[in-house]
Amino acid sequence: MAMTTTANPAAITTALREDLSDIITNISPTDTVFMSNIGKAPVKGIYTEWLVDSLTTAANCAVTEGNVAVPTDGHAQTRTGNYTQIAAKWISVSDTIEAVDKAGRKSEMAYQSGLMLKELARDMEYGLINNSTSTSGATRSACGLKGFITTNDTSFTTGTSITTLTETLFNDVIEACWTAGGNPTMVLANSYHKRQISAFTGNSKIVTNMDAEQKKIILSVDYYESDFGVIKVYASRFIAEDSSDYRTVYILDKEKFQLGVLQGLKTEKLAKTGLGQIIQMSTEYTLISRNELASGAIKNCASIAAH
């Protein structure tokens, strides 16, 4: 018996509906561990400054009975600062794209704005960690952790065989921060160094965070119990590598850092000039480092296993 036309699949393909899921999958990393863990402070100019002070070294203060007063000069503060940096993104959505029926979202404008917000936050996190200088001019840039932490900076010599992050070195930097008066409570490390820290021989001191809500927000967290206090160890996706594939492990007193905000996040619809709409999302910010002595860095650590 011959097959009828309506029973022949090849003859009715133009009438078949497409099967396109309304679920959009995007696994691009968006966690901003450093920025999410520091406080915020308003700033009032494109160059914000603050004062850093220190006490004299502790010593025996006994004086002779009836001793004549011997005044000393007062403490002189050190003035430091950072330029603000403008971060902005734009997206154009045509009136037609906004009007048509779309898979996975109702409004293209709302969907693209959500993506821009995540991208902007990632860009800010990257700069807050990796920027090494503060620059003026029309295109200003804010110095990040890489540029601020200079004193408790224990670096391997790039190109030598001594490139493995060790527990002794890790604790040496924690001790240096504590000796200077800091109380480091946070470690930022890339995935490779995070695994190295978890594998320290004293790993009985490593405790996995079981706070489900906290892990949901900021991903992997461990607690390392050092001789100078308990420190949270975070895996950061945005610690940049140099040309030799070396990276930095940051040991931070997070209370000494703040996100300085000159212009908060703004989402604006720009004036229409045609058959579409341009969305502008922007913010202006800087990193405030109250006292870099409270934190430390282990630089030039190999971020891949030796071959």
Describe these PLM feature segments.
Residues 1-307:
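Flexible, glycine/threonine- and acidic-rich loop/arm segments that mediate assembly and lattice contacts
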